[in-house]
Amino acid sequence: MDFASLIERQRIRLLLALLFGACGTLAFSPYDVWPAAIISLMGLQALTFNRRPLQSAAIGFCWGFGLFGSGINWVYVSIATFGGMPGPVNIFLVVLLAAYLSLYTGLFAGVLSRLWPKTTWLRVAIATPALWQVTEFLRGWVLTGFPWLQFGYSQIDGPLKGLAPLMGVEAINFLLMMVSGLLALALVKRNWRPLVVAVVLFALPFPLRYIQWFTPQPEKTIQVSMVQGDIPQSLKWDEGQLLNTLKIYYNATAPLMGKSSLIIWPESAITDLEINQQPFLKALDGELRDKGSSLVTGIVDARLNKQNRYDTYNTIITLGKGAPYSYESADRYNKNHLVPFGEFVPLESILRPLAPFFDLPMSSFSRGPYIQPPLSANGIELTAAICYEIILAEQVRDNFRPDTDYLLTISNDAWFGKSIGPWQHFQMARMRALELARPLLRSTNNGITAVIGPQGEIQAMIPQFAREVLTTNVTPTTGLTPYARTGNWPLWVLTALFGFAAVLMSLRQRRK
């Protein structure tokens, strides 16, 4: 049996789809093999050529299952370690999540073959990127969204990175789909013309990486210190551990006062309600102000609402140089985009009694506003995002201000142990710095704590799973990238034009 007849078998295509999907995981950190993104997407498109809509949908689903099954299996670490459920149930939940996310790639492939069944330039160069943009938007929006493993992030060190400050990471997704589709067409049709067009399209954005959209402000360079406490997740919310945790962070911070202008503690570094820690916070605030330093820390806050109930927030507060700390101070940030099951539980009256996984510590948070003013610490303006929020490009951009000196993200990835999850999270954070041309300060409990430059480059970092302090000089920048000015609107206009053209041309072809 020759290869041509073998590849026509649907079962073979489904198996290959799984493999091509799994290959895509190599494009992301910590592997960082960016060509794997093109190979994976090329395989997806080639396998759906000359297939009926349901066959294509199955191929798209299997491809997605290969990608998400291999790329987000780190979720298993937190479920198995802290979920309190039998092993088979843990595996089932991870499989269920991967299968759910694969519905979107299945939808993409099925609709593509339904509306544009012919293997043509129209399908791969116009219809495919527009439809992919829509289905990826749905994946990042429905049920609060999970926009993880978008292939644009693979280009943070790749040839297309220069497109990010211009139109954002989603524009890189768009171009990767177009290029990979043309390569698939060239391979299947054995035609050099799509290959030439693909190479030209891929090369066009390369010079953009040499455009500097920002102006450094060396006169405002400061020393920043980020304390990585490395508190085990199993002990983090243990009441008996609270005093020891505060000692760890304070002892690491005391020598930095008067030396570092800005000191940063990670997400919920203070594992207690803010109102309970007023004596500690006020004493620390006074000491910081006396020595001319400021501190930014994660903490938990609970406020009485109009219904006479408490709203609990995942919060960032500032202490030190400037106005004295006050519990009523507006210089704070409350996390807006909460993670299901980790920070709130849907249908909690039903799910919480079922297993510890649905009743984790601090899983009843309330949302802060979508738009919040920047934090101000020691005269430094910080656009903040807590943990998962840093992967939400449009939300970070909407909170960004022209006078922002730095992007700030604090996180606690201890939930995911030594898996690849924290590295993928770190890669996405780097893209925010590139899109908005600002240095990014990333402070975490156990890694990856780092300073990212305004071009997405790693300027300084410390190892994971170590109780260390990262101290370095950081220079703020000024200036607005095109993406900072417009967000995703230009890409959505382009998507609408491509979609309209694809539908119109398809209708004309069917009438002939």
From Swiss-Prot:
Pathway: Protein modification; lipoprotein biosynthesis (N-acyl transfer). The chain crosses the membrane at residues 14-34, 57-77, 91-111, 124-143, 168-188, 194-214, 487-507. The active site is at residues 267, 335, 387. Keywords: Acyltransferase, Cell inner membrane, Cell membrane, Membrane, Transferase, Transmembrane, Transmembrane helix. Its main location: membrane. It is found in: Cell inner membrane. Residues 227-476 form the CN hydrolase domain. PROSITE patterns: CN_HYDROLASE. GO terms for biological process: lipoprotein biosynthetic process. It is a multi-pass membrane protein. It is an enzyme of class 2 (transferase). Signal peptide: none annotated. Catalyzes the phospholipid dependent N-acylation of the N-terminal cysteine of apolipoprotein, the last step in lipoprotein maturation. PANTHER family: APOLIPOPROTEIN N-ACYLTRANSFERASE. Belongs to the CN hydrolase family. Apolipoprotein N-acyltransferase subfamily. This is Apolipoprotein N-acyltransferase. It comes from Shigella flexneri. The gene is lnt.
